[in-house]
């Protein structure tokens, strides 16, 4: 038999196997090594532990450094700044050198890692994944794909345009996303601070109630949907998604090994078929497709150029 014929035979056999066994295999895929990295990074990002006791926000030199993931500046344990909040504050004025730093560091993160940051280095993404592990009926988001474009609207309107246009006398932008939409601000900021600070408890009002409702909706949604905030509303994920295809950290599909069984597409919780678009904007590099692949055709790669050949074998 020719190589093409052998590949087709293997594909047919594995296709049968994947249909019968993939659901069981998905249940056995071990995600805890990645969750371990997520937990470690969340701990490092919020390593100012004394803040949780004193109810005070850390304001040291490290707070001038942006972390790559969505982590609230106002979290009493936060050792670094949230890139979204920092960008909103300075986007309205070029007189702040800090604005160039924020923009540059975001682009650097995106070009180096893309949405690998979402899959490994975002505390709020990890939080949603843990909620999704709660035993309950799970719903697919494949039919809700149009909602993924909402996060780009959030990025454009709430993170760029409104802070750019609505600036104070000092040239500082109003952080619309942080104030009116971000649930991480309630989870990491308002809630822990209010537990130890009576003044903050007394100041909580309608805006807190609104954002608490958003957080509750995200929590409930995360139990049945996989990472709904990441898919539909996160502006930081939207920014990294724009750079996913050109980032140095990419996914590679070896078409000589790929047998088009579809196991990777069925395993992907971000609704991506990696054999068609290895570096899709929604791919968070979680590695589920790699572990589901029966022929080890999918790999991580780091470097210039997209070496993936996405042409899969067809009859």
Model-assigned labels for residue ranges:
Residues 1-12:
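Single conserved hydrophobic/aromatic residue that forms the stacking wall/gate
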Residues 15-275, 281-315:
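Non-ligating segments of multi-cofactor redox enzymes
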């Amino acid at each position: 038999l020719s190589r093409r014929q052998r590949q087709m035979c293997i594909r047919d056999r594995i296709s049968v196997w994947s249909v019968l066994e993939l659901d069981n295999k998905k249940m056995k895929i071990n995600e805890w090594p990645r969750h371990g990295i997520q937990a470690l990074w969340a701990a490092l990002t919020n390593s100012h532990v004394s803040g949780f006791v004193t109810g005070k926000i850390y304001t040291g030199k490290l707070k001038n450094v942006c972390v790559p993931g969505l982590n609230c500046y106002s979290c009493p344990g936060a050792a670094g700044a949230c890139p979204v909040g920092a960008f909103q504050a300075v986007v309205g004025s070029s007189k702040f050198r800090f604005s160039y730093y924020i923009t540059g560091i975001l682009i650097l993160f995106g070009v180096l890692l893309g949405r690998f940051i979402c899959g490994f280095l975002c505390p709020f993404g990890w939080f949603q994944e843990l909620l999704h592990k709660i035993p309950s009926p799970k719903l697919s988001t494949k039919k809700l794909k149009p909602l993924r474009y909402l996060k780009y609207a959030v990025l454009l309107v709430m993170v760029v345009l409104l802070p750019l246009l609505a600036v104070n006398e000092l040239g500082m932008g109003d952080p619309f996303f942080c104030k009116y939409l971000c649930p991480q601000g309630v989870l990491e900021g308002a809630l822990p601070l209010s537990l130890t600070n009576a003044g903050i408890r007394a100041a909580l009002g309608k805006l807190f109630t609104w954002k608490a409702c958003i957080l509750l909706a995200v929590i409930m949604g995360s139990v049945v949907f996989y990472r709904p905030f990441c898919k539909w509303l996160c502006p930081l994920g939207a920014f990294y998604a724009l750079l996913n295809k050109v980032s140095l950290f990419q996914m590679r599909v070896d078409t000589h090994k790929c047998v088009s069984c579809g196991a990777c597409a069925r395993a992907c919780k971000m609704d991506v078929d990696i054999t068609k678009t290895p570096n899709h904007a929604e791919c968070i590099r979680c590695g589920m497709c790699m572990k589901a692949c029966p022929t080890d055709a999918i790999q991580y790669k780091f470097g210039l150029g997209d070496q993936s050949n996405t042409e899969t074998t067809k009859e």
